[in-house]
């Protein structure tokens, strides 16, 4: 990226990376997930550093995820919490570290640690909808694992908020009300007016996606709090999972 092309730009938001759950986690796919995030971010950070003396962007909002925290049970996690263990934690640490050239050049760098984004056309919800719509949905495993979610509306608004407000470092992009997988399944079934009583044993998804993906994406418990957003006065459009799912699926507020 030619640094001159960045002159006059005030801020850059960079979220690119291969889909986490698009394919089975083979060794090559895991390497693709990592490198698609770190290499592009490193190149962008270097270009931003070179552009800064020329009048380039002052702000970089770079992608990350709550996978940074790993499987933590019922522990309440804030931006100050230490990293967890596992592949996704390793990816997030490397992804955030890839911005260091921009940080050293004096840009304000903020990392968007995003949770489960509720979108009908992509992500976890898009994969669950077909099962739940025909009455085959239910909790995964024990169902006690926490899911930290955010509506797509709030995700976009939070990214804009990170540009406009003087925040640097990690920012948890999740709604304040994390729920268990059982609660999520019941609420989704209610919104769709379908039963959600069929528990899904981990073996089924593991055969399709691989045990590593299932363990870290479906069975891991991550109870994350949006401390920076809430402390900075960010106004969530959706505090209720039911309300967020209704708007996402039916296109209108609850």
Language-model regions: role of each:
Residues 1-39:
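NAD(P)H-binding glycine-rich loop region in Rossmannoid oxidoreductase-like domains
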Residues 30-32, 41-86:
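Conserved Rossmann-fold NAD(P)-dependent oxidoreductase catalytic core, especially the SDR/UDP-sugar
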Residues 64-65, 97-120:
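Conserved beta-loop-beta element that borders a ligand/cofactor-binding pocket
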Residues 83-88, 115-122, 142-150:
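Glycine-rich "substrate-gating" loop/helix at the edge of Rossmann-like oxidoreductase active sites
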Residues 93, 105-107, 118-127, 161-171:
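Glycine/proline-rich active-site loop of Rossmann-fold NAD(P)-dependent oxidoreductases
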Residues 100, 129-137, 145-179:
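Alpha-helical substrate-binding/gating segment
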Residues 158, 164-212, 246-254:
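Mid/C-terminal beta-alpha module of Rossmann-like enzyme folds, strongest
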Residues 216-254:
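C-terminal amphipathic/interface module of NAD(P)-dependent oxidoreductases
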């Amino acid at each position: 990226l030619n640094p001159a092309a960045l002159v006059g730009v005030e801020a850059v938001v960079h979220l690119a990376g291969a889909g986490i759950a698009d394919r089975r986690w083979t060794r090559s796919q895991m390497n693709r997930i990592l490198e698609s995030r770190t290499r592009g971010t490193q190149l962008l950070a270097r270009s931003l550093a070179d552009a800064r003396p020329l009048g380039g962007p002052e702000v970089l909002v770079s992608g990350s995820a709550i996978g940074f925290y790993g499987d933590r049970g019922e522990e309440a996690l804030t931006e100050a919490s230490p990293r967890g263990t596992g592949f996704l934690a390793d990816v997030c640490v490397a992804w955030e570290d890839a911005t260091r050239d921009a940080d050293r050049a004096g840009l304000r760098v903020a990392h968007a640690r995003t949770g489960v984004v509720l979108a009908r056309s992509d992500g976890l919800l898009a994969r669950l909808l077909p099962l739940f719509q025909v009455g085959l949905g239910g909790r995964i495993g024990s169902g006690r694992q926490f899911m930290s979610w955010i509506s797509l509306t709030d995700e976009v608004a939070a990214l804009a908020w990170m540009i406009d407000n003087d925040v640097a470092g990690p920012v948890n992009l999740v709604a304040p009300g994390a729920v268990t997988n059982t609660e999520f399944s019941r609420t989704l079934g209610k919104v769709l007016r379908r039963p959600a009583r069929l528990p899904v044993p981990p073996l089924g998804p593991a055969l399709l996606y691989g045990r590593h993906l299932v363990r870290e994406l479906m069975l891991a418990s991550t109870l994350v709090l949006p401390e920076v957003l809430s402390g900075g006065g960010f106004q969530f459009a959706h505090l209720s999972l039911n309300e967020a799912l209704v708007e996402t699926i039916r296109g209108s507020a609850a």
